[in-house]
């Protein structure tokens, strides 16, 4: 499929993502639930209240909700939110349009699920994102998901340098799991890892 012509160029603004969802140009979308998340949920005895920032179409929302996990998903793109709500059926109310930096979750959180949110934003905003992660999560809570590692200056997706990302996270989070990913979409193939970080 040919890449549509876009006019919005700043991924820090909703308009950038509105255009892409309007044209159904979402090469980052897994169109399902990744294997690492399936295994992680199966390994956890107690449901974890989870926030999914930058949820996009939100396939994981229905999976977590069906598993009995309290879940809240947000996106600042109204077109993305409408797409997610249309796809999620009975779980549509789990998705809201909101700005991650000012949003207050409706429940205390046990986990934030990272899936193509951090890498969607310019690297200059990452310290602010990680500070907000730390504000939202109490000690012992988890930041779990997929982290994109790449040295290209272009994006999105914006890749991280592993030591640099670890340096940003280490003051407030401890790494508990780090594994390669074998079921990535083409946009992330060979360049993402499943990681679980625990709030200090």
What are the residue ranges of the model-derived segments?
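Short catalytic micro-motifs in class I SAM-dependent methyltransferases
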Residues: 116, 120
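Class I (Rossmann-like) S-adenosyl-L-methionine-dependent methyltransferase catalytic domain
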Residues: 2-51, 56-107, 123-200
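A conserved beta-strand element that flanks and buttresses the S-adenosyl-L-methionine
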Residues: 113
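Conserved acidic residues
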Residues: 110
